[in-house]
């Protein structure tokens, strides 16, 4: 399937095997299966290649100048490169439990220089988030163990910890698979913790959904205002925000003029 593929043995026996593939100018990271977890365009590393990663950045409609972003799940560093390029003033922390993923990302996926604005932490993200109290503007969760979404990242306790970690206008964003038989139960837990302030933004392909939960109700909910914001952001970030708004309207509860959050 892939003209180039290399296998990297896991540093921890219980963790999935890390593999790298290349097809044309696209380098991808896999965890124990053919499923692509992260991809990088070798000609344009900051570009978000996978549609689910693009959808997850839809939170920028409500906060286009986050000061602090917590990533749970480093993968191939797609968000880290994007943030470094388009949000250079944001402090970004990427947490991953798998040391081999971190090593491979550093070696093969052109991560930003680690320093004041970017840090990688080897830790369990479900534990690490507990150190934050109202201080992070966005939490991006993309946790996959090679077979399914990591259970520890779908519990009400985890969602409560994330809610406490968020700043007043903070947004929790997670990547889930709509075909997972547990999907609706995940949504119900999130709705319960965030008191209904949850929306779904389907990715363009493959059944992934960027699910967003808000610490407090955002002021920007009018469709007309959202479309205006989308037009402003498309040129700045190179993402299809207008299409995001269309998909939000197709998927979520609404009135004639407003998205209900």
Curated annotation (Swiss-Prot):
Protein name, as recorded: Polyamine aminopropyltransferase
Self-association and partners: Homodimer or homotetramer.
Protein family per UniProt: Belongs to the spermidine/spermine synthase family.
Top-rank lineage group of the source organism: Bacteria
Organism for this UniProt entry: Chromobacterium violaceum (strain ATCC 12472 / DSM 30191 / JCM 1249 / CCUG 213 / NBRC 12614 / NCIMB 9131 / NCTC 9757 / MK)
Protein's GO biological process: spermidine biosynthetic process
Matches recorded under CDD domains: AdoMet_MTases (cd02440)
UniProt entry tagged with the keyword Transcription regulation: no
GO cellular component term, pick one: cytoplasm
Localization terms from the record: Cytoplasm
Disulfide partners: none
GO molecular function: spermidine synthase activity; thermospermine synthase activity
Gene3D superfamilies xref list: Vaccinia Virus protein VP39
Active-site positions on this chain: 142
Keywords: Cytoplasm, Polyamine biosynthesis, Spermidine biosynthesis, Transferase
PROSITE patterns (UniProt xref): PABS_2
Record: residues binding S-methyl-5'-thioadenosine: 96, 124-125
All residue ranges annotated as the PABS domain in the record: 1-219
């Amino acid at each position: 399937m892939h003209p180039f593929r290399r296998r990297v043995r896991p540093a921890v026996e219980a963790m999935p095997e890390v593999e790298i593939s290349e097809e044309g100018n696209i380098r991808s990271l896999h965890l124990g299966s053919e499923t692509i977890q992260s991809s990088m365009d070798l000609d344009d590393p900051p570009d978000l290649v996978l549609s689910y990663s693009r959808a997850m950045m839809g939170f920028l409609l409500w906060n286009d100048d986050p000061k602090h972003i917590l990533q749970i799940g480093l993968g191939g560093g797609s968000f880290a490169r994007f943030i470094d390029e388009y949000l250079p003033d944001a402090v970004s922390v990427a947490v991953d439990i798998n040391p081999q993923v971190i090593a491979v990302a550093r070696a093969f996926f052109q991560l930003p220089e680690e320093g004041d604005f970017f840090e990688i932490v080897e830790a369990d993200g479900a534990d690490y988030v507990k150190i934050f109290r109202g201080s992070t503007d966005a939490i991006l969760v993309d946790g996959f163990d090679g077979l399914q979404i990591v259970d520890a990242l779908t519990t009400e306790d985890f969602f409560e910890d994330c809610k406490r970690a968020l700043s007043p206008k903070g947004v929790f964003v997670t990547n889930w698979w709509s075909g997972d038989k547990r999907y609706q139960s995940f949504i119900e837990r999130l709705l319960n913790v965030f008191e209904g302030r949850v929306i779904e933004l389907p990715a363009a392909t493959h059944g992934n959904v960027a699910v967003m939960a808000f610490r407090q109700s955002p002021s920007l909910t009018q469709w007309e205002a959202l479309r205006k914001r989308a037009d402003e952001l498309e040129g700045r970030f190179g993402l299809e925000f207008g299409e995001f708004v269309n998909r939000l309207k197709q998927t979520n509860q609404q009135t004639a003029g407003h998205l209900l959050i």
